[in-house]
From Swiss-Prot:
Native organism: Chromobacterium violaceum (strain ATCC 12472 / DSM 30191 / JCM 1249 / CCUG 213 / NBRC 12614 / NCIMB 9131 / NCTC 9757 / MK)
Name of the protein in its database record: ATP phosphoribosyltransferase regulatory subunit
Gene3D superfamilies found in the cross-reference section: Bira Bifunctional Protein, Domain 2
Keyword Nucleotidyltransferase (UniProt): no
Keywords, ordered alphabetically: Amino-acid biosynthesis, Cytoplasm, Histidine biosynthesis
Pfam annotation, one family: tRNA-synt_His
Role this protein plays: Required for the first step of histidine biosynthesis. May allow the feedback regulation of ATP phosphoribosyltransferase activity by histidine.
Subunit structure, as described in the record: Heteromultimer composed of HisG and HisZ subunits.
Cell compartments where the protein resides: Cytoplasm
GO function terms (MF aspect): histidine-tRNA ligase activity
Amino acid sequence: MRNWLLPEYIADILPATARQVESAKAAMLEGFRVAGYELVLPPLIEYIDSLVSEGDDTLDLKTFKLDDQLSGRQLGLRADITPQVARIDAHLLGERTGVTRLCYAGSVVHSRPSGLTSSREPLQVGAELYGYAGIEADQEIIELMLATLEKAGVKKLRLDVGHIAIYRGLAAAAGLSPEVSRELFGLLQNKDAAGIAARVAGVAEPYKSAFLALPELYGPAAVLEKARTRLPSLPEVELGLMQLSAIARAMEGRVELSFDLAELRGDFYHTGLMFAAYAPGWSDAIARGGRYDNVGRRFGRARPATGFSLDLRDLLRILPERDPSRGIRVSARHLPAAAAEVSRLRAEGEMVVVDYLGESAAALNCDRELVPAADGWQLAPFH
């Protein structure tokens, strides 16, 4: 019998880690709440055309699909919560005309892992701001992301920032077909210099040189001035560089900051500023975000939008384990005499564990015990 085995890249979360997960999640959601973000809980399963937009091949491949025996339509297990929140803003909260701030926390399921150490069941936590196109909204989301990570215990963060509209503006001006643009987009994501050179060999100047320059335009804020001299003066390029400069000024001294104009490792729906947070010693981003204006258009309401998300399972791998709180042992033989005192302690937030077998302090996760006293009950050390 091997029915206890789980699928590849799927794992249980055991008690010590589960406590840390729930504690971190609660702290993050509270941080969102005090910043004005309202919690939503989208369903795990939806019709596939709500979860995946046409042309989003990456998300489509990630999404588990099954048939609905009630309607006959195809369903999907969500692989990303952002499209669901966009649907909620566009359809269920459509009466709101101003800024809407929403947050969420829940499991998503991927048909394939995103990396060798990744889970196929990430625990996605995120926050999104709808209804304001100004760079101030992006700054708010970046600040919220950094504060969330710092509160969780991540130190010495690095923030990488890019702008996908710069690439898309160049692709449109160069007259690239959607297929070629998507292929070149993938080559830039993978930093494939030889592939990029081959793909743009027939592209007219100045766009050919611009595409070849993109992978070289990375580094501190000074690289933005270099970009102004190497990229053609297109509206999308000018706006993108202006917004990146605004982020450079806003984040100066706040966090280690770098810019990468070929950093396009976002999602299909991103439209502008993109950013990722990195921790020392880890090559993969621990949180990502960006602008995705008009993501709700297919739900009947196009609005400016920006947000970020993280995988709490991944994040916990880089955080130090916290010493769990210890409980109070009460021997089963003291019940029901001690029942009132046990109830009082639990009401105060103490963990009180009934010991039926005379187990050790380590087994019970207790460092104190409830013992009889002359005037009732008292706590004594338990080793």
